[in-house]
A protein has these predicted regions:
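A compositional/biophysical signature of low hydrophobicity enriched in polar/charged and small residues
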Residues: 1-138
């Protein structure tokens, strides 16, 4: 996992040499990790650099069942990160949209249209400074 977090395109043979396994063993382990949902290998992009001019985190307060609201939010393609949480908000949802009009439309016409949504607070991203996915393993 550490080897692939450093470079998701690293050859299995190279990983095998670094960790003392054969290429076939590395391939099988990676396949098992992917199939079990432990790991994904994806290209991570900066949305602002690939045509999406607006990203924001939406804090959502809910009356009632937060998981039911999260189920409805999951279906929205603009939401790329969604967590049910404790604290000031019941749910945090990250959205990536083409522009401010699109962001406003998603918030007003879709998120706030969910009956259990009591209120929202929008945190518009101005600049992506750090984004990592290298938590390592235990």
């Amino acid at each position: 996992i550490d080897q692939l977090q450093e470079d998701g395109r690293r050859a299995y043979a190279t990983i095998g040499k670094a960790v003392g396994l054969s290429e076939a063993a590395v391939r099988q382990r990676v396949q098992r990790l992917q199939e079990s949902g432990v790991m994904q290998i994806v290209a991570v992009t900066d949305p602002m650099q690939v045509g999406f001019s607006r990203a924001a985190m939406i804090g959502i307060r809910v009356d009632g069942d937060a998981e039911a609201v999260a189920d409805a939010l999951e279906a929205m393609p603009e939401i790329d990160y969604l967590v049910v949480c404790a604290g000031s908000f019941d749910i945090l949802a990250e959205l990536v949209t083409e522009d401010d009009d699109h962001l406003l439309d998603v918030i007003n016409r879709r998120i706030r249209a969910i009956p259990e949504v009591r209120s929202t607070e929008t945190f518009v991203y101005l600049m992506l400074r750090k984004q990592i996915y290298t938590w390592g393993t235990r």
